[in-house]
């Protein structure tokens, strides 16, 4: 029976890729809270913190039938900062009750405060690291952000060393030379894996009301003369 379900789900995923109709969504990304507790230089989400939007228990419960229909196995809670939603763990409980795993993408500022609940309701955590301590704090415009992240990761790992915590780093002209320190810091924290992605400077992502003008893009985008240095890292 399980084999037939798996085969059907694989077919539905294939069908989704081959047509313009969604038949399968194994992973769904939700934004429980639109505001953020960082002020990152490469992101505009925090600039709209006053216009708060957040998901409720009713919102999540209302999605369950569709998630079941599309064969969803995992929900990634993104943001903004998902942990700013006061009912965040109730949302996770509803999803877990439907057999759906929850992953959390977070700034990491408050994971120590929520460690017990995270270990209970969230399958894994993905934190953001932008550099070593001074650079991370500067890019996020939050003094002490790095140490709060480090303390949170360390505490959770001390409770459950096998709990999976990974990191992602957005690479841009302010931190590309700090690539190796990022890896070293992640190792020292006990983070299981680090992934890297380039900064998006030209789309409407990250709550941009309009695409950045070229002068703003060049504050974040690597210049041509910096590429040789990037290749040496």
Where are these regions (language model features)?
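Conserved alpha-helical substructure of the radical SAM core
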Residues: 2-124, 218, 222-226, 230
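Radical SAM enzyme [4Fe-4S]-AdoMet core and its adjacent flexible, acidic
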Residues: 98, 121-124, 128-130, 134-233
